[in-house]
Amino acid sequence: MSAKAYYHLPGLFEFCEFYRAFLPLYRANRDWFYDWCEIGSIYGAPADCLWGGGRAGFGECGAREALALAQEYGVSARLTFSNSLLREEHLSDRKCNALCELFSQANGVQNGVIVHSELLTNYLRTRYPALYLVSSTTKVLTDFEDFRRELDREEFRYVVPDFRLNKRFEELNALSQVHKDKVEFLCNECCWFGCNDRKRCYEVVSRKNLGEDCEHRCKAPDAQSGYRFSKAMENPGFIGVDAVLRTYLPMGFSQFKIEGRGLGSALILEFLLYYMTKPAYQLRVREEIYLDNMLDLF
C-alpha cells in the first residue's frame, strides 16, 4: 500500500494568481487538508509555446515568477510540452529552450516536462538531463500492452495512460511495484468514454500551437455543454476521492493528475476542495480565497 497520494495540479502559468492565494493557505492550515495527500507538482505552459500540447496555452504569468512560486512552496514545476507533431526545425525554438534552461537550473525540488514527441523526448534527455520526463496522456494509450511497454521505458519517471484504462483493475494490480510507482492516473476527465476521436483532438491543438489554422468539432454527446465536474463524476473512468484512498492507494498507486488548464480558476478550487480538503473546512477555504459577506452572484 502507498502511504500518500500525490496530486499533479493544472495551471502553473494559467492560474499563477490562484496558487499565490492557495499555497500559503495550504501551508498555514495543513490540518484543513487530508494528511494522506500532498501536491506532487503543478504543470502548465505559457501562451504561444511552440512545443505546447494538450490544451492551447493561455498562461500569462512570467516564467521566473511561476517557478519562484513553486520553489517557495517546495512543489515540482512541470512544463507541458506535449506537442505531438514537432519537426527537427522546431527543436531550436528559443522560447521553449529558455524555459527548459531556466527550469533545469532551479534549486531544490526537481522539475520536469510532460512530453509526447519522440523527437523532443530524445532532445530533452540529451540537452536538459536535469529535468525528469512524463509520458503524456495525449498519446492516448488505450491498449494495456502498449501502456505496459511505455512503463518499461526508463526515460520516463511517470506515464499517464488514457483515462479509459483507469478501471482495468486486474491488469493494473498485476503490475510490478516499480511500474505502479510510475503510473499517473488522470482522475477527472470529462471526455466521452466512447470517443474514437481523442487523438485527433489533441493533434488539432498541436497544429494550432504550430501556428496552423485548423478546426475540430467534438462529436461527443452533450459536447456543447463543455466541461462540467458533475458530468466528469459520472464518467466510467472517473477516479473520486474515496477511490483514491480506498482502492488505488491500497493497490500501491500514488500518482494522480487533475486536469483543468483550459477551465476557470473557480473550478480548479472546486477540484482542490473535493480531492484534498476535509469537508468540515471546505467552506473556510472558500471564505479565505474569495467568499465574503458582500459577494453577489447576480
What residue spans do the PLM features occupy?
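Active-site pocket-lining/capping segments in soluble small-molecule metabolic enzymes
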Residues: 1-150, 156-298
